[in-house]
Amino acid sequence: MTRSRLLLVGVITITSAAAATAYHASHPANRTAFSTRAGSIAPAASMLEPRSGHTATLLPNGTVLIAGGMRRNQDFYKSAELYDPAVGKFQATGEMNERRVSPVAVLLRSGKVLVAGGWIGHGCTDSAELYDPSTGKFSVLASRMSTVRGDARGTLLPSGDVLITGGADHDSPGGIASAEVFRAASQTFQPVSPMHFARVAHTATVLQDGRVLIVGGRGDKVNAVAEIYDPKTARFTESGSLIIARYKHTAGLLANGGVLIAGGSDEHDWNGNLNSAEIYDPKTGKFQATSPLNDKRFKLPEEAVLLESGDLLVAGGSRQAELFDPAQGKFLVVSGSMDDARHFMTETRLRDGSVLMAGGYPNNDQATAQAWIYRP
């Protein structure tokens, strides 16, 4: 596996007594049992292409845009497809103008999707394009990012602009500190003050007050120090430290305004998978440990899915999906399982409250076209 592939980040079926019996027979006795309250997952239709390191974006019409990604190694895609929940199938749409793995993909207020950067082979790109659902086509933007970025993070700000942070470039595959904002009105990129630390495979979560929490990631080493981006000042400030430094983890905004940080890996990557979890409190600017995941997992979708119940769905990096229940402060194991542990898969909440989980690869690095549906 190439070094660049290791850095990619990024986003699960039978429920019966027999399945539960088999599960408990092959797992530690102290593991949380299947919970009917946690919902279940089942296979859905397959994508048109096997993909990992792709993007999945819910469009205003309820369909999901799947773009880019890779089959394995240097087999990168320009192609894109749409998942239609009404018929439960994937269909082709226009392809991107450049092959991309782990680009930024953000739905804009206009209904179009910004796709920027990503791995293109032995390096990254600074190019960007817009997907227009009304035409089913991608168009190249005249403006380019201030630097090439692979596995950066893109976050929609309250203003409708997009904050883009970190990632890797040709000279710093371990992460960069620079940041910029995509101005939606002018369709241009504008550099802002850099982060205090270089980061790739980090998370960026919009808080209830509109600021953005940046957590984890890797520069010269895996980082524990968090930062807050304030759109009013266009600057980053340090804000507390993780109890355990991590990258390739997931993060999710809780209904009470806190942020769950779960899983990921330490400096040892495949040999350092984590099951620990912690919660960031924006009122105190500190992290506090919470109950661990039932499975160690990394290479997760960067954003855990917030359900209508207020629970957070965490999937990927394991055959099993888990639900974090804030009221209990613990993770519940979801009934059903994927065919294998899936890394760099995506998870997207649909309009009906279910969640589409698509693609990813197991330990053999061969991506799958299979998708799954989680139902609460």
What are these regions (language model features)?
Residues 11-13, 40:
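Generic short N-terminal amphipathic or hydrophobic helices
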Residues 14-24:
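Hydrophobic alpha-helical membrane-insertion segments, chiefly the h-region
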Residues 22-376:
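Kelch-like beta-propeller repeat domains
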Residues 1-10:
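N-terminal Sec-pathway targeting helices
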